Regions:
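Active-site-adjacent structural elements in enzyme catalytic cores
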Residues: 1-193
């Protein structure tokens, strides 16, 4: 498990690691996340194995901007999309209808996919570095074993997930006390406060 700082060089190394099929850990608004290329089935399944998370639950995708998320989602009516976009960047995850060709290793047993544009500047910069490297969206799931408390520091990632990520982007989380709010984009209903 390698650890790198949050410099522009570190972001390029993280993007290279993602392109090579590696799993990375990085800070978000509240907790550390595990990430990889969402189109790399092997890397996604490795994250699920690290977390001991069943595939049917689905995963969250983050992007530097909405353009990174469009390949995975179907739009809703303009007023609803404007509400969603106004909540970003920030700790607001929305369940949007998934495109029919979105892989089931991302959607799980759902017709929707969870997406957001993170408010943590480093998480957003990581997404931008990945996009510049030819990627787009990035898997984002809390760095923890299923049903266990998530890691909030790089050291906690190492201790809680010893068979965890290949690379840790070592920086502070933004200090939010809770992970992102999850809402159904069609109804606005809060699914996780």
């Amino acid at each position: 498990m390698r650890s790198i700082g949050p410099s522009s060089f570190g972001l390029r190394l993280a993007a290279q690691a993602i392109a090579a099929g590696e799993v990375i850990a990085y800070p978000t608004e509240a907790v550390y996340g595990l990430g990889c290329d969402p189109l790399d089935a092997r890397a996604v399944r490795r994250i699920l194995a690290i977390k001991r998370r069943p595939e049917h639950k689905g995963l969250i995708l983050i992007g530097a901007d909405l353009d990174a998320l469009w390949p995975f989602i179907l739009p809703l009516e303009p007023a609803r999309m404007a509400e969603i976009e106004a909540s970003w960047p920030g700790p607001n995850t929305w369940l949007l209808p998934a495109r029919p060709d979105t892989p089931t290793w991302l959607t799980g047993a759902h017709a929707t996919i969870a997406v957001r544009i993170p408010g943590h500047p480093l998480a957003r910069a990581l997404c931008a570095a990945w996009s510049a490297y030819g990627g787009g969206a990035l898997v984002s799931t809390s760095a923890n074993l299923a049903a266990r408390p998530p890691a909030r520091t790089a050291l906690e990632v190492r201790h809680r997930l010893p068979k965890g990520p290949d690379l840790i982007l070592n920086a502070r989380c933004a200090g939010n006390p809770r992970p992102s709010l999850i809402r159904d984009a069609r109804t606005g209903r809060v699914l996780r406060p």
